[in-house]
Each structure stands twice: as structure tokens, then as C-alpha cells.
């Protein structure tokens, strides 16, 4: 069995790790970095860039550079959060035929699962390069507060990337695994995870290799991206006051502002003041304009204070659901890049009444936990049991649009629960089961996961038929629902596929596209290699022809020059086969030139050798005594 890798598919950065002996190890990517920006770009000529190369060209290609796409995964186009995101990103968010939010570049649409798959492919390649073997199985992390549609979409992303996703694991739970595996500690810990796009808090009990999640809460639209945008808006407002130009209307300027904001935010975690300097940010009739501004940590903290405060309520709810007080938490573990911000650490300290634990790398700990879970599933890590929970209540819509819970939030998974319902009208022969996830009392206020019909119910007065609805949640937190008429034994079930979501045929098409793209990438690489080889051949042949062309006859010289000309022409295009063919023709034609060069070298060598022989003979001539005397 091949290695199973652990992947932290983050909003801003992603990370891959693998078990190495008894411990998990983070794998460096081709650029030598331990994390990879979760950014995908499409270039002018249709080439796809992932990670650092995509981030580097974002300023000059803002409309085709997709970042923070994780915030769109599993979301409908009309979701208020998507509406909010549309005004903040330079790329196009469009409505897919199934009603989901997708992204678009050059008229081609991509589902968030597809874009995430490009990032997962990069992580897969990183692991394969390190391990020297093919990798096709993974454990992938998601925010604990992700709903069913978002989990399913993440699993789809894995499939598109050519990975069998053995388990979807919650990010705070993965972090707790990494934190607690080597420690003999027992106790109750809180994992405070503020990342690039999402916030989670989980309360866990750890002891004797058992990691039991007691409760979880969070906000899937709160993270570093929001802190960046707060700063972007502040910089744009200040510039508009001064110059009368709104930089947000210029996509190129907006991307430069975003990069500067992210850099300033990071710097202000370790320094109390930073300078933002963006020359030639825009221009008007009077000439070019520059943006230069000093920003203090205090000002930045004031700008984002409400965002930091938004993390407090989920923490209180998680404590309440776990039946604990802050004083009963033995350790608070910080996860996610945003927890490096001093203000965040201060709020956590005030809330839990203790200094948070900073002994884990907030950018890598989740991937390490995923690799440990991969080790557990592979049988390499023994005596570890992970008991996670479902983050949101699950139920169905009943008479009057009421949301009737069947499984409450923070129920340990996997789990299975049933409840019996009946008909609302006399002689009703079919019922529609509408499945929802959330905490509101009315079904319409919650997230609808899907619906299905149970047909063929025998005619009976209302309230008589007995319909048993069963919810089954697997270890990935993905839901299956079935409904059974107890009188006839007729059963109908669905694996919940969000009312949007990707169909199996769409996933298969995207898998094929990904494979075709891999083939396309290989072709592109082969073309580059062929060009490099041909360039070198042209250069060496021209040099040899200039130096030794006089030693071959005119016909041979002409055929070399013709082959050179053909290859130069082929090099103007991208046809790898044509370049290879013309390279071979030139190599064949140049053989006579090579022979002439070798003949000359041999002749020169023989003459030199003859000269050497004379010298040697002279040196070792013996002279007898008689000759010496006569001399």
C-alpha cells in the first residue's frame, strides 16, 4: 500500500505532510517552501499556474488569478456571503447552471472544487517528488464549521485531483492530534483556529490516546482575508480623500493594495509601525500618483477590532455546549496565521484567563495532524482514537415550515438516528422529505441540503401512515438520509448532494479535464525541453560550421545550412514533434562536419605525437665511453 498523505487545504496557504517513522513531517514544495499559496492563475496563453508562480504574477493578471476560493466552495451564488465576496475580489464570480457560485476567466467557468483540485494536485506532486512514488490517497482537512455541501465539495476536489479521500477531518481536531500525540498530558483543551478565511473553535478532551471533541463552533466567513480587506478599504478611502481617485475601481491597483495590506498586516505582528509605499499606483491628467502612508499597530487594531471581537461569541457557545467554564480549560492551542497577531492573543488570554500555548507552528500543525490521521488509517500510528462531532443540527421540514431536528449539533460521529413521521392530509400517497442543516427554528432559515420523494404510500387517513426517516452521518461528517414506509417496506434514500453541488458526470468530466491538463502540461514541458535542446544544437552547429566549414565539400555544407534554417523556423512555433524531427535532421546532416573535426583532431594529434617521439629518442640516446673520449 502506498503512502497516505495529509493535506491542509487552506484559504490562503496549503500544506502537505506525511508520516516519517513515528512522527509527521511537512514536505517542502518545488520552490523550497513549507506552505504553498492557495492561488491558481490562468495566463494569456492558457497555461495554469499554481502556488507561488501564480501569486507572483497576480498584480499584472488580477482578473485571471483566483485566490480564497475556499470561501466559495459548496456555496450558492445567491448566498449573502458570496454577494459580499463579489465586491472584494478582482476576478469574476458567476452563477453556474446548478445555482452554485463558480469563477470565470476568459469565458471559461471553473467550479470552486475544480480550482481547489488544482491546488490539491500541486500538493500531490510535491509529496510524490519527495517520496519518489505515486500517491493516490489522502486525508484532507476542512473547517470544523463546514456544512455538508462544503464537505462534499471538498471531497469532490480530491477526486478531481486524482486522490481517493480516505477521510475529511476537522482542522481544529487535526491540530489537537498534532499537539497531543507526543504528550502524556490529559485534560481539556480549546483549539482557537483563526486562518485565512475561516474561524473555528473546538473543545476537546485528551487522555490515553483518545481525542474526544466535546463541542465545536465557528464562522466560515471570518479570517485573514477580511483583515486584509479592512486595510485595503482604509488605504483606498485615505487615497480618495487626498487625490479624489477611488483605487477600488482599478483592478490592477486593487491587487497591489491587497498585496501591500497583507504585507503590512504581517509586519505589524512583530513591529509597532510600518510604511506602505506604492509608487505609480495610478495616474490622472496631472500625472502619476503615488501612495505613501505610515500605519501603526494601534491604528490597524482599531480598524479590525470588531473582527477580532467576532471570535468571542463562538468560543462562549462552544464552552456552553461542552458544559464547561473557561477556567476548566487546561490549555488553549493557537492555530492559523492570524493568531500571530498580538491583539488576537490578547483577546484569547482575556477570554480563557490564561496565556495561550504557542508551541505549535500555526501554519503547519493542521497538515501534521492530517498526516497523523492518515497514519492511523494506514495502521502506522497505533492507540489513537479520534471522536469528532457534527457541527450543525440536522433535520427535516415538517408541517408549517418548522425545522424538526433529528440529530443535534455536537453529536459524536459516525452516528445514525431515526424518527417516525406521518402524512399531513387524507389519502396522501407521496411525501417530500426536505433535509436541512442549521440551528434556526424555521426550516427556510437554515441551509437546505437536498430533497427526495417517497412514493406509493397506501391511501389512509392523515396521521395514520408511519414514515421512518433515518439520518446517517459518516466519519467525514457527510450525510445519508433514508425514508421508509413501515406498512409497505418501501424505502427511498439519498446520499445528500447539495441542491447545487457537482453531479457524478460533472466530476468525471473534471477528472478527465485534470488528466488532460496533466497531459497538456507534460506536452508543454516536452516542448520546452525540445526547444532548449534545439537551441543548443543550433548554437553548436553554427560555431562548428564557422570554424570547420571549409573542411567539408559544398554540397554537405549546403545541406547543413538548409537543416539549420528549417530548425530555426520550427523554433518559432511550439510543435515539439516538428522541433524534434528537424533537430534529428540537423544532427544527421552535421555528422560529416563532426567527422571532419575528428579527422583534423586526429591528424593534429599524430603530428604532435611524432614530435614527441623525436624528443624522447634524443633524451634517451646512450653514448659509450669510447665515443665520449674521442669527442
Swiss-Prot record:
Stored InterPro entries: ATPase_NBD (IPR043129), Chaperone_DnaK (IPR012725), Heat_shock_70_CS (IPR018181), HSP70_C_sf (IPR029048), HSP70_peptide-bd_sf (IPR029047), Hsp_70_fam (IPR013126)
Keyword presence, ATP-binding: yes
Domain of life: Bacteria
Keywords: ATP-binding, Chaperone, Nucleotide-binding, Phosphoprotein, Stress response
SUPFAM superfamilies, per database record: Actin-like ATPase domain (SSF53067), Heat shock protein 70kD (HSP70), C-terminal subdomain (SSF100934), Heat shock protein 70kD (HSP70), peptide-binding domain (SSF100920)
Any one GO molecular function term: unfolded protein binding
Similarity comment: family membership: Belongs to the heat shock protein 70 family.
Region (Disordered): 517-536
Induction of the gene: By stress conditions e.g. heat shock.
Modified residues annotated as Phosphothreonine in this record: 198
Protein name per UniProt: Chaperone protein DnaK
Keyword Nucleotide-binding: yes
Known role: Acts as a chaperone.
Amino acid at each position: 500500500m502506498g503512502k497516505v498523505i495529509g493535506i491542509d487545504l487552506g484559504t490562503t496557504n496549503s500544506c502537505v505532510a506525511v508520516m516519517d517513522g513515528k512522527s509527521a513531517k511537512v514536505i517542502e514544495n518545488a520552490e523550497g517552501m513549507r506552505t504553498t499559496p492557495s492561488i491558481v492563475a490562468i495566463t494569456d496563453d492558457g497555461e495554469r499556474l499554481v502556488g507561488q508562480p501564480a501569486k507572483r504574477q497576480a498584480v499584472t493578471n488580477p482578473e485571471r488569478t483566483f485566490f480564497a476560493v475556499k470561501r466559495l466552495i459548496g456555496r450558492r451564488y445567491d448566498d449573502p456571503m458570496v454577494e459580499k465576496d463579489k465586491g472584494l475580489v478582482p476576478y469574476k464570480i458567476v452563477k453556474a447552471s446548478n445555482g452554485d457560485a463558480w469563477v470565470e476567466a476568459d469565458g471559461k467557468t471553473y467550479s470552486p472544487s475544480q480550482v481547489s483540485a488544482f491546488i490539491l494536485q500541486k500538493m500531490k506532486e510535491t509529496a510524490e517528488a519527495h517520496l519518489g512514488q505515486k500517491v493516490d490517497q489522502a486525508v484532507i482537512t476542512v473547517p470544523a464549521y463546514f456544512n455538508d455541501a462544503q464537505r462534499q465539495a471538498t471531497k469532490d476536489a480530491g477526486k478531481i485531483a486524482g486522490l481517493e479521500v480516505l477521510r475529511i477531518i476537522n482542522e481544529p481536531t487535526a491540530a489537537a492530534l498534532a499537539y497531543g500525540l507526543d504528550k502524556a498530558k490529559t485534560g481539556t483543551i480549546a483549539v482557537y483556529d483563526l486562518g485565512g478565511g475561516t474561524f473555528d473553535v473546538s473543545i476537546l478532551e485528551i487522555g490515553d490516546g483518545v481525542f474526544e471533541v466535546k463541542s465545536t463552533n465557528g464562522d466560515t466567513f471570518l479570517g485573514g482575508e477580511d483583515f486584509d480587506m479592512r486595510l485595503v478599504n482604509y488605504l483606498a478611502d485615505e487615497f480618495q480623500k487626498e487625490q479624489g481617485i477611488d483605487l477600488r475601481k482599478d483592478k490592477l491597483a486593487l491587487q497591489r493594495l491587497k498585496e501591500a495590506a497583507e504585507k503590512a498586516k504581517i509586519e505589524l505582528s512583530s513591529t509597532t509601525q510600518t510604511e506602505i509605499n506604492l509608487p505609480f499606483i495610478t495616474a490622472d491628467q496631472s500625472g502619476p500618483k503615488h501612495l505613501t502612508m505610515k500605519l501603526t499597530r494601534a491604528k490597524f487594531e482599531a480598524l479590525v477590532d470588531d473582527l477580532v471581537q467576532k471570535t468571542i461569541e463562538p468560543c462562549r457557545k462552544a464552552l456552553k455546549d461542552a458544559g464547561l467554564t473557561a477556567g476548566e480549560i487546561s490549555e488553549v492551542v493557537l492555530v492559523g496565521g492570524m493568531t500571530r497577531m498580538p491583539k488576537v492573543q490578547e483577546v484569547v488570554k482575556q477570554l480563557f484567563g490564561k496565556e495561550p500555548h504557542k508551541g505549535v507552528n500555526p501554519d503547519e500543525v493542521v497538515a501534521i495532524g492530517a498526516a497523523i490521521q492518515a497514519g492511523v488509517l494506514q495502521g502506522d500510528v497505533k492507540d489513537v482514537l479520534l471522536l469528532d462531532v457534527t457541527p450543525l443540527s440536522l433535520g427535516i421540514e415538517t408541517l408549517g415550515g418548522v425545522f424538526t431536528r433529528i440529530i443535534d449539533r455536537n453529536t459524536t460521529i459516525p452516528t445514525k438516528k431515526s424518527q417516525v413521521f406521518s402524512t399531513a392530509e387524507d389519502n396522501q400517497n407521496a411525501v417530500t422529505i426536505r433535509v436541512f442543516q442549521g440551528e434556526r427554528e424555521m426550516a427556510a432559515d437554515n441551509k437546505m441540503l437536498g430533497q427526495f420523494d417517497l412514493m406509493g404510500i397506501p391511501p389512509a387517513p392523515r396521521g395514520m401512515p408511519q414514515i421512518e426517516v433515518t439520518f446517517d452521518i459518516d466519519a467525514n461528517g457527510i450525510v445519508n438520509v433514508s425514508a421508509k414506509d413501515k406498512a409497505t417496506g418501501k424505502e427511498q434514500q439519498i446520499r445528500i448532494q447539495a441542491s447545487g453541488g457537482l453531479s457524478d458526470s460533472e466530476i468525471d468530466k473534471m477528472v478527465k479535464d485534470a488528466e488532460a491538463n496533466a497531459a497538456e502540461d507534460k506536452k508543454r514541458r516536452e516542448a520546452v525541453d525540445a526547444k532548449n535542446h534545439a537551441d543548443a544544437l543550433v548554437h553548436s552547429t553554427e560555431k562548428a560550421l564557422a570554424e570547420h566549414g571549409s573542411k567539408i565539400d559544398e554540397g554537405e555544407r549546403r545541406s547543413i545550412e538548409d537543416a539549420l534554417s528549417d530548425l530555426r523556423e520550427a523554433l518559432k512555433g511550439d510543435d515539439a514533434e516538428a522541433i524534434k524531427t528537424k533537430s534529428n535532421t540537423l544532427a544527421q546532416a552535421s555528422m560529416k562536419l563532426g567527422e571532419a573535426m575528428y579527422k583534423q583532431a586526429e591528424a593534429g594529434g599524430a603530428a604532435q605525437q611524432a614530435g614527441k617521439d623525436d624528443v624522447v629518442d634524443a633524451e634517451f640516446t646512450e653514448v659509450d665511453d669510447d665515443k665520449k673520449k674521442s669527442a
